[in-house]
From Swiss-Prot:
Family to which the UniProt record says this protein belongs: Belongs to the cyclin family. Cyclin AB subfamily.
Ranges in a coiled coil: 122-184
Domain of life: Eukaryota
Protein name from the UniProt record: G2/mitotic-specific cyclin-4
Pfam families linked: Cyclin_C, Cyclin_N
Known role: 2/mitotic-specific cyclin essential for the control of the cell cycle at the G2/M (mitosis) transition. G2/M cyclins accumulate steadily during G2 and are abruptly destroyed at mitosis. Degradation is necessary for the cell to exit from mitosis. Plays a role in morphogenesis by negatively regulating polarized growth. Through binding to CDC28 regulates cytokinesis, partly by phosphorylation of the actomyosin ring component IQG1.
Induction cue: Expressed from S phase through G2 and M phases and is degraded at the end of mitosis. Expression is down-regulated by the anti-fungal agent plagiochin E (PLE).
Molecular functions (GO terms): cyclin-dependent protein serine/threonine kinase regulator activity
Domain Cyclin N-terminal: 234-359
Residue stretches of biased makeup (Polar residues): 25-41
Length: 486
């Protein structure tokens, strides 16, 4: 009887002979076949050779026959590897899938040439956005430089001339820029505060009159360490720089294929409802709108992804401002679960990357609190001003307006409706804007409230509540009073 070991050895020898005969037959058939092998076979063989080379450094199972065949065909394997690498390198680029794309590709996926033209056109538009934003940054830098010259307590005659020249250049550039915008974009012209020599001189006079080298002993903020009153001038100068730095493109909707300004109003109305549902801070709402506008200034978005942009912006803003922010599951639920959690997280990373991690836009609330010092923090005035301030996020004319100017205008019109008196020099000092600069803004804010239930329904319903002093109803009562007198 044959031993178990000898029988196993004979079976192994028989198996080796069969494998050797099969491999020789395959090699002979390949050499006798005319022409070159197909591309798919090259792919498969090259993948096998690549895998064998990678596993060579980390052997797990020793296959003697496979290694022998691999060494026999080492020269042909290297050629196959080069062919495979060339084909795959031209075929796809894995780096394009690192970030989720919120743009909607309106073209056929099979038409590669049309897709390339679409990408080239998108790159050109994005470069145009960058150039336009750089022009706006230079204009805002000129404004901030002029303000720094004015706010300096030790202004010399030479510095006055420098500020004067800067203002004249600013006026010329602003006029030419506005004319270009009207000629290119037609009707949509954003609102900006007016600047001229008379306004500059008035501001200089008020600042020199009310600026002090020592803290006011009668000011309660002097004794509150959390208010850091000794640093307030430097803090608000820096906030003015940030509001200019993070200004969105006021005409970004002209480059959006699927979106319109009316759609933005619908999205903001939904954001207001979600914001009120979670009882978040006012700063979170304004920061959300700024993220949306800045993101849309740099990327094209399809209508199917538009709500995702608003939800993700609210999610990021809540993380930045709130102590207890809503979870991603709650935000997804408020979006009717139209997007998965994974889509939310990918879109969040993508939006932060597009915003270049610049999330510290100041918003109007800090400026509104600063202005409230001029009337001893009158509660009714500030509450009504919050209503006027919040309706600005619905109007496309205020997309690129400075939040400090919007806060001053909301406070100004609130004092008029409540009969609190004129816009005093102290208000000019704390706001940085004169009455002449705020009158056009106040007219637009008041006009937007005439059809409040249509223009800003969610905000109107929100400010009907008692905790907001029924501010929206008060404004409607003011209109009825005006109509009855006329």
């Amino acid at each position: 009887m044959r031993s178990y070991k000898s029988s196993i050895t004979d079976e192994n020898e028989l198996t080796k002979q069969r494998l050797r005969a099969k491999s020789i037959a395959n090699l002979s058939s390949n050499h006798t076949t005319a022409g070159q092998p197909s591309t798919s076979s090259q792919h498969r063989e090259a993948l096998t050779d690549l895998t064998s080379q990678e596993n060579k450094n980390h052997p797990r199972v020793k296959l003697t026959q496979t290694n022998t065949n691999h060494h026999r065909n080492s020269s042909s394997s290297s050629n196959k590897i080069q062919i495979y690498q060339q084909i795959e390198q031209k075929k796809t680029d894995i780096h394009q899938f690192k970030k989720p794309r919120l743009e909607k590709v309106l073209l056929n996926d099979d038409d590669d040439e049309t897709d390339d033209e679409f990408d080239d056109e998108e790159d050109k538009e994005n470069r145009y956005h960058d150039l336009e934003l750089n022009e706006d940054d230079s204009k805002h830098q000129l404004i901030s430089e002029a303000f720094e010259t004015i706010d300096d307590r030790g202004i010399s005659e030479g510095e006055n001339d420098t500020a004067q020249e800067a203002r004249e250049r600013l006026e010329e550039e602003t006029q030419s820029h506005t004319q270009d915008m009207r000629s290119i974009y037609g009707v949509h012209v954003p609102m900006q505060p007016m600047w001229n020599n008379a306004i500059i001189n008035e501001l200089k006079y008020v600042i020199q009159k009310y600026s002090r080298n020592t803290l006011d002993e009668n000011d309660e903020d002097t004794y509150d360490t959390t208010m850091v009153a000794e640093y307030s001038p430097e803090i608000f100068n820096y906030l003015h720089e940030l509001e200019n730095k993070f200004t969105p493109d006021p005409n970004y909707m002209d480059f959006q294929d699927d979106l319109k300004w009316e759609m933005r109003a619908v999205l903001i109305d939904w954001v207001v409802q979600v914001h009120a549902r979670f009882n978040l801070f006012s700063e979170t709402l304004y920061l959300t709108v700024n993220y949306i506008d800045r993101f849309l200034s740099k990327r094209r978005v399809s209508l199917s992804r538009f709500q995702l942009v608003g939800a993700v912006a609210l999610f990021i803003a809540a993380k930045y401002e709130e102590i207890n922010c809503p979870t991603v599951q709650e935000i997804a639920y408020m979006a009717d679960n139209a997007y998965s959690i994974d889509e939310f997280l990918k879109a969040e990373r993508f939006m932060i990357d597009v915003l270049e991690f610049d999330l510290g836009w100041p918003g109007p609330m800090s400026f509104l609190r600063r202005i409230s010092k001029a009337d001893d923090y009158d509660y009714e005035t500030r509450t009504l001003a919050k209503y006027f301030l919040e309706i600005t996020i619905m109007d496309s004319k205020f997309v690129a307006s400075p939040p400090s100017w919007l806060a001053a205008g909301a406070h100004y019109i609130s004092r008029i409706l409540l009969g609190r008196g004129e816009w005093t020099e102290l208000h000019v000092f704390y706001s940085g804007y004169t009455e002449k600069q705020l009158q056009p803004l106040a007219d637009v804010l008041l006009e937007n409230c005439r059809h409040a239930e249509i223009n800003h329904k969610a905000i109107f319903e929100k400010y009907k509540e008692r905790r907001y002093r029924k501010s929206s109803l008060f404004v409607q009562e003011y209109f009825r009073h005006i109509m009855s007198q006329s």
